């Protein structure tokens, strides 16, 4: 899996309330959630982000309350991947479950600046900053996780597996 795009940067401890504020939790419509994605961290983000772009953040991205709305909002906004120095474990699981690729790399989080163009090679385990000519390590995704992401998340992945096994 290769993902390439322009980066939007955020700091440490971006919690799920900054990703999608609690006042929007009464909706499950992905399009509506996308319109408010990152609203409390950067009110202009949802209007600027383009399909295929990448969020890069510091430590503990997705901390706070466990809400599937957070990765859904990010994915629905068109974000192709999230790179962070570290993730809150529940956010990590929720993101993978809905098919949002996320990559933990403290080196990439420190080196990538807003507007940089990067290429993530999930199989090879590297992030190349095409703007700065730097390469950062990232743990490669095992093949089954690449399949799960490519399927669009856990539910579509399981549905395919069940369908092909019958």
Swiss-Prot record:
UniProt keyword rRNA-binding present: no
Keyword Nucleotide-binding among record annotations: no
Pfam families assigned: Aconitase_C
Stored InterPro entries: Aconitase/3IPM_dehydase_swvl, AconitaseA/IPMdHydase_ssu_swvl, LeuD, LeuD_type2/HacB/DmdB
Matching Gene3D superfamilies: Aconitase, domain 4 (3.20.19.10)
GO MF terms, alphabetically ordered: 3-isopropylmalate dehydratase activity
S-S bonds: none
EC code: 4.2.1.33
EC class of the enzyme, as a word: lyase
Subunit structure: Heterodimer of LeuC and LeuD.
Family listed: Belongs to the LeuD family. LeuD type 2 subfamily.
Name of the protein this chain belongs to: 3-isopropylmalate dehydratase small subunit
Organism this protein belongs to: Moorella thermoacetica (strain ATCC 39073 / JCM 9320)
